[in-house]
Amino acid sequence: YAKPGGNPHSAEVLPDGNVVVASSTGNLLSVYVYNGADSYVSRPAFTMPVHSAHNVVWDRKRGCLWTATGAQLLKLAYNGKRTAPELTQVRSYDMAAGNTDAHDLAPVCGEDAMYVSTNQHVYKFDCAAEKFLDVEIFQQNTIKSISTGPEGYSTIVMRPTSGGSNWWSAEVCDMKGNRLFNRAGYQIYKARWYVENPFGYPEVHTL
């Protein structure tokens, strides 16, 4: 539908159907107007500079957008104007000193919280208390993605095991480091459960 460029890492669907994309080397968030009549949109309707943008998550309860960059979590307001979209920063939350290069940001299934990973640490951000909490995990550094599911689902983690490359792996593991999936030759950067996401979407939707 669009070619954002700048090494897109994540995308999120906004309540009006528009799509926001995080591009890391482009250092920006791009909002594309969704039009069911068009098969391709050449340009974003809005862009916002975000250093090394890797992630973006819609928070349905608060009606806001979240993105983690460097050692900060940013809370963004969306104006809700489908044909003239805009994002503005509302607040920033600082992580502990020494954190760099935020990677993943993902809702915790069944909780009012999100996992945040940086090059050095993994946190759970309590959205109601607005606090970063430490997480018990087999490895704190360079976690590329974390994904949770309903009861009975393991929390799945992707961390690089690729030697000379520092971003991919052929396997997915759980929070204790146990291997859950492995395929020789695969280069996995991000692993997600394909499940409903009540943090961002209503129970009945068409996405």
Each PLM stretch: what is its role?
Residues 27-30, 73-75, 122-124:
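Structural signal for beta-propeller blades
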Residues 5-14, 50-58, 95-110, 138-154, ...:
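Repeated scaffold domains used in trafficking and secretory/extracellular systems
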Residues 21-25, 65-71, 114-119, 157-163:
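Conserved beta-strand positions in repeat-built beta-propeller and related beta-rich domains
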Residues 1-2, 39-48, 88-96, 131-137:
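A short beta-strand motif characteristic of beta-propeller blades
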Residues 8-10, 16-57:
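Short N-terminal edge-element motif at the start of the domain
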Residues 69-113, 118-119:
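Eukaryotic tandem repeat interaction scaffolds
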Residues 33-39, 76-86, 126-135:
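Short loop/turn segments immediately following beta-strands, especially the blade-tip
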Residues 30-37, 131-133, 151-207:
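C-terminal closing repeat unit and adjoining cap/tail of repeat-based domains
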